[in-house]
């Protein structure tokens, strides 16, 4: 065998070896989802991948997407694993346990509240309530994914002690509003606002079937039809304000209704959005920091929403 033949065979072997490596890498990459820019949240690197904010209409079983952080070629990825979370009490328990396992929930209070209030009562019949994804609720609106509810509850937890006041803008089917009520108790006050009357009616019926029903009956929890961009002045100021849709800028009425020492969590931006945490100082000035990249429906008028934005 001459030198040229040996060289050609070596080249072929090397090309074959490289092809195998590339195919193996591609296969591994397909099973992983690249994270959006990571942030430090709850003592660890965490960021919700954009894929988790989209609804998978082909999913008919109650499966929870486990989030397993690992390193590959110096980058962080989420492994998407399927977990049978079941239905009812076993479903919500499985959902919460997995959010705890992967570092999304670190607060005992938040875990207890999300397990107490059954998400299955707040999604349309036939939807996968315990999958970590947003679910369409009609009227061009969605109920946020469980990991976003958990994130917002933890960001607002210090402002949701018994006796405090909370405003939920874009209250939808009422799930997060009900969570707020469980946290501030009967001596507190929780207000949900949505500009779609049918969703407000739906949220009231949902809460009436839940563990938060007593707060609705007592009057410490109320849901109203209105333009959430204007807040709800009647029970202001609020210790905590949550906005469930993305605004291009912070609505001034919401800032005005935020109590000094209070906190607002709001997604800001158009196509590229960030979840902002706004703390109002005692002198009325504000401090803003970015928590993570997100993707929400826009905070807009009822006409624009029903028209598909």
From Swiss-Prot:
InterPro entries: PCMT, SAM-dependent_MTases_sf
GO biological process, one term: protein repair
UniProt superkingdom: Eukaryota
Tissue distribution of the protein: Expressed in rosette leaves, stems, cauline leaves, flowers and developing seeds.
Enzyme class, broadest EC rank: transferase
Keywords on record: Methyltransferase, Nucleus, S-adenosyl-L-methionine, Transferase
GO cellular component: nucleus
A Pfam family that the UniProt record links to this protein: PCMT
Location of the motif Nuclear localization signal: 23-28
The enzyme's E.C. designation: 2.1.1.77
A GO molecular-function descriptor: protein-L-isoaspartate (D-aspartate) O-methyltransferase activity
Effect of pH on activity: Optimum pH is 7.0.
Active site feature: 144
Record field: catalytic activity: [protein]-L-isoaspartate + S-adenosyl-L-methionine = [protein]-L-isoaspartate alpha-methyl ester + S-adenosyl-L-homocysteine
Reported induction: By abscisic acid (ABA), drought and salt stress.
Record localization: Nucleus
Function: Catalyzes the methyl esterification of L-isoaspartyl residues in peptides and proteins that result from spontaneous decomposition of normal L-aspartyl and L-asparaginyl residues. It plays a role in the repair and/or degradation of damaged proteins.
Family (UniProt): Belongs to the methyltransferase superfamily. L-isoaspartyl/D-aspartyl protein methyltransferase family.
NCBIfam families: pimt
Name assigned to this protein: Protein-L-isoaspartate O-methyltransferase 2
Organism: Arabidopsis thaliana (Mouse-ear cress)
């Amino acid at each position: 065998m001459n030198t040229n033949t040996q060289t050609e065979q070596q080249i072929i072997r090397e090309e074959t070896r490289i092809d195998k490596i590339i195919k193996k890498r591609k296969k591994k990459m397909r099973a992983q989802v690249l994270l959006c820019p990571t942030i430090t949240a709850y003592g660890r690197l965490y960021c919700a991948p954009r894929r988790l904010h989209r609804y998978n209409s082909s999913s008919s079983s109650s499966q929870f997407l486990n989030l397993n952080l690992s390193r590959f070629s110096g980058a962080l990825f989420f492994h998407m694993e399927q977990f049978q979370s079941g239905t009812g009490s076993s479903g919500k328990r499985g959902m919460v346990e997995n959010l705890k396992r992967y570092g999304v929930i670190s607060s005992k209070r938040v875990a207890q509240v999300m397990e107490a209030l059954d998400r299955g009562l707040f999604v349309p019949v036939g939807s996968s309530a315990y999958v970590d994804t947003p679910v369409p609720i009609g009227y061009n609106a969605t109920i946020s994914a469980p990991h976003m509810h958990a994130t917002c509850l933890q960001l607002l937890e210090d402002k949701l002690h018994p006796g405090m006041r909370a405003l939920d803008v874009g209250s939808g089917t009422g799930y997060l509003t009900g969570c707020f009520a469980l946290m501030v108790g009967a001596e507190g006050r929780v207000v949900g606002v949505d500009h779609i009357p049918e969703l407000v009616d739906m949220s009231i019926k949902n809460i009436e079937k839940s563990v938060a029903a007593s707060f609705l009956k007592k009057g410490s929890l109320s849901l109203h039809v209105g333009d959430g961009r204007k807040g709800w002045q009647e029970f202001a100021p609020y210790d905590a304000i949550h906005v469930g849709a993305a605004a291009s800028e912070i609505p001034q009425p919401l800032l005005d209704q935020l109590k000094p020492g209070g906190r607002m969590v709001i997604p800001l931006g158009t196509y590229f959005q960030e979840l902002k945490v706004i703390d109002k100082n005692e002198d009325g000035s504000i401090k803003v920091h970015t928590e993570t990249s997100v993707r929400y429906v826009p905070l807009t008028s009822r006409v624009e929403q029903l028209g598909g934005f």
